[in-house]
């Protein structure tokens, strides 16, 4: 793996990591932050890792930004990761290197080896493509912010919330669903409540903004459009990280 472990205020910048010699077990071929706090990864490019970008084991306050990840999936992999930011990244998920095939994946609470992930993780201004669902949340996820991204999925929904996944804001994203049968957002559990869906555009899929056992608390200004060429969202504030550096006083 290439990640910080048990670290604070560390940086990994301006690097290329090309493949891994072993991908056969837990902890191998990861790129990200493990038991880390307030760390930064910037301008990194990876090829053929298993899980990249990745947060795990209570990583909190970490940022991964302006990076490109080829043939691996984004992960909140274990242990109550919370309040982390992924922004301005490109993730090209693929099967074959040990990734799960989702664009981004968060471990479920019933997984005894990994456990659930915590609140207020943020995905901002990213471009994510995958064979399976764009974002798969296993449960106990609270108040995640999914803003100004493009998700392109060969099959499955744009966002899948399994159970007890609640109070998320999913706003101003573009979802490109190629299978012709999936909704933009699937709320699998009746306890997936308090979710806001605003200003999103669905291209393809089954033409439904949301399906499942729960309904969003707010759904407005969402569009459904035929499958076709799209462009990424262009938020007026491209980077939360840079905005904070400019505007928040020490």
What residue spans do the PLM features occupy?
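Extracellular parallel beta-helix/beta-solenoid repeat domains
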Residues: 1-250
